[in-house]
Amino acid sequence: MAIFAAATRLATKREQTLCTVFEWYDFYLYGSLSAIIAAQFFSGVNPTAAFIFALMAFAAGFAVRPFGAIVFGRLGDLVGRKYTFLITIMIMGLSTFIVGILPSYATWGIAAPIILILLRLFQGLALGGEYGGAATYVAEHAPHGRRGFYTSWIQTTATLGLFLSLLVILGTRTWMGEEAFAEWGWRIPFLLSILLLAISVWIRLTLSESPVFKRMKEEGKTSKAPLTEAFGRWENAKVALIALFGGTAGQAVVWYTGQFYALFFLTQTLKVDGATANILIALSLLIGTPFFVVFGWLSDKIGRKPIILGGCLVAALTYFPLFSLITHYANPALEQAQASAPVTVVADPSECSFQFNPVGTSKFVTSCDIAKSFLARNSVNYSNEAAAAGTVASIKVGDQVITSFAGAGLPANELKARSDAFNASMTEVIREAGYPAKADPTQINKTMVVVLLTVLVLFVTMVYGPIAALLVELFPTRIRYTAMSLPYHIGNGWFGGFLPTTAFAMVAATGNIYYGLWYPIIVAVMTFVIGLFLMPETKDRDLRDWH
């Protein structure tokens, strides 16, 4: 009997992990093919409608996920884990498949982007319900003392889903050629999701309900109002707040910094070509991914709290030197130019905006904003010098001074012409000063860059490997799905999701390419302090505690 139970647990872990990989595959396709999708569905939309669609696409990726956590978390605590995440994967899979057959703007007009955004919103809602269900289900099947190890496999699924989506896209692109892929071949990865959906539904139909939930339901102890019980009672709401600020907020920024901001830093700041950057990131993920399981297993031995909080602290203490070293090994010419050719922006401080632009639709057209935006895009460190009110901003590069221009009120065509001229003159000046247009491939120390990126990924595995077990153990069975899902998706959807745009705005405002790292550092330190004093250790808790 014990052997059969162990085999069932292992099969549950394996099958649930596979299904969650498929769901992440569906979610990542949109991001991986966003440029082609934009050309197919938004090319004929007027600016006002495009702004609305951009906001909604952004909401689907980040802001909508907590609402999915509420909807499906409640359902999971009312009717069961198995059937709830069966619903989430059907919504995700069907939404992805429909994108593959959806006519473009040229065929259906305005209806095409509207339907696309609705499908994307459904994807965000489904993803908001998937994680809590998968983590709860696996944890409630896991043997006591091994929940960290079992749930850590769920933590590998986002990385594996990204790998799978990139592999399918690369294979299709190579087979068809770039022109055919951009015209219609991009639909194939979306259409293939119907096969993955069929496999996932079959797997989940064969799974049994969580034994802990099943027993609780048989004894009539399920919650009649999970949302009210989870967040309307202070004793439970307090735990959810501690889980957010003392757990998932720090976990999210460390996760995004190690996997997404590192890629952004390589391609946008250090100007490493996209293919090389993707290979470097992929190698670091390949090396680091097994450590999700290692740290999950270790958390069963020494506790969830020391590993997660330790990951937040060591990340906060080492981000600046690590990213400085990445610059040194990935683009030494840029590092040298920053040291030898200092740049100063002279501007009226009242004209300098904090360029926070999460959906990419805001326009920054003061002379200061135009100057700083150019320098930030070109990875040029600069200092700030205050000028008299109303002064048009200028940029000093050594002995040269280039005057910016005020773009407010200019017609679109004139604004573009002035911007192009300013950018051209500034580009010539910074190239003469030694700032490279891109990283020289022959000067990139790929081995050292992969080592440094792997260190960042190891921080990710420290905070992310044990987090599912921690969240599951914080809440009683009757409200577990609901209560753990919301802090997880607020942390990852909002604290983590805003990281790239917040970091870029901080860089543009201060003139330091590393200044954006203060955002994840501050959040990680906040989580360390709150978690240290308020977060309980949970590894020895019994999940059969329903009260």
Would you name each region that the model predicts?
Residues 30-31, 236-284, 322-323, 350-385, ...:
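Extracytoplasmic gate region of multi-pass secondary transporters
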Residues 102, 108-128, 333-347, 443-462:
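Hydrophobic core of transmembrane alpha-helices in multi-pass small-molecule transporters
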Residues 126, 148-173, 196, 322, ...:
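Glycine-rich segments within core transmembrane alpha-helices of 12-TM secondary carriers
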Residues 324-451:
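Low-complexity, proline/glycine-enriched hydrophobic segments characteristic of transmembrane helices
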Residues 78-90, 301-312:
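Cytoplasmic membrane-interface "Motif A"-like loop-to-helix N-cap segments
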